[in-house]
Amino acid sequence: VEDKPANNVLLVGARGTGKSSGVKAVVNSFFDKGLRLVQLTKEQLIDLPVIMEHLRDFSSKKFIIFLDDLSFEEFEVEYKYLKSAIEGGASAKPENVLIYATSNRRHLIKESYKDRGANDDDMHRSDTLNETISLSDRFGLIIYYMAPNQQEYLDIVDGLLKQHGIELSKEELRVKAGAWEKEHSGRSGRIAQQFVTHYLGQVYNK
């Protein structure tokens, strides 16, 4: 937004740790400065060059092309369009466009045991493997989102509850919020928010 050089960004972390929310919060924070979000699915990556050229015409705006929960199976080739776009391809990426992607794994392309096999008859297997693993390295900035530990999770729940004027004792917070995360998919900001929503529903129904 300040017309300075900036890197494409890959946000890596477990589910519910706030990767997507973080990207959307950035766009909301700088909306008044002309920042806009264009969200694509991986199936739309084939159209990425055309989309970027279209965005180039809106030079007064800045765009984040957002790819949420991105990963590829070994047989999918859409990653080639993304790699080409990041590296410049036939035409340079517009100066008003950056690519942000979120993923649950550091290497975006699933690697099979066959890819590692020494007896594979594909003489270019090593080059192919390096190409797929290196996709994430094409992002200039990689940000890791770590799942919260037990105390951090409880602090998140406590903070969310206090926003609604509710304060639980440390023991009640530990028991109730702890039971909730054990019944669900572990500790994360999303799980904390879901517990608070559930708890508020119980309180308001009384």
Regions found by a protein language model. Give the residues of each.
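Pre-Walker A adenine-sensing motif
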Residues: 1-3
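Walker A/P-loop nucleotide-binding motif
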Residues: 5-24
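Loop/turn-to-beta-strand initiation segments
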Residues: 7, 35-36, 60-64, 93-100
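Switch/connector loops and helix/strand junctions flanking conserved nucleotide-binding motifs
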Residues: 19, 48, 74, 107-112, ...
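AAA+/P-loop NTPase substrate/partner-engagement loops
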Residues: 29-63, 70-75
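Conserved catalytic/switch belt of AAA+ P-loop NTPases
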Residues: 57, 74-121
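Conserved AAA+ ATPase "SRH/arginine-finger" region at the nucleotide-binding site
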Residues: 120-133, 140-154
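C-terminal alpha-helical "lid" subdomain
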Residues: 146-206
